[in-house]
Amino acid sequence: MFALDAVICNTDRHFGNFGFFIDSKTNKIIAPAPLFDHGNSLFNYAGEDDFASEKALSVYADTLLPCVYDDFIGTAKAVLTAEHKEGLRKLLNFRFKRHSRYNLSPKYLALIEKQVRERARRLLEK
């Protein structure tokens, strides 16, 4: 959860939008529930000026903070597992699959793709 939120800059992860599957007989945690509520991510509130360039979007991304912990990258790095790192390595070549009719502008998509790749790279740095 922390790694994904760091990659997509999900500013709205809070204690009401993640959970766990619980064994009803033992009342023990079985597994984390699937993640949901990623609506405040991928620079959805960024303005036209923020999408003016790769640098501008990077500066904007660095102003975003998670809702209930201190920072995206540091918190995610503290809990990364080998499995997380494997997934992050796959994001180093990330590209959105374009829909035939519904897309942001090619410029916006390219800038967001670069941010996803860069944020994955930052998480993998030692």
Feature locations, PLM:
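Anionic ligand-binding catalytic core segments
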Residues: 1-10, 15, 19-126
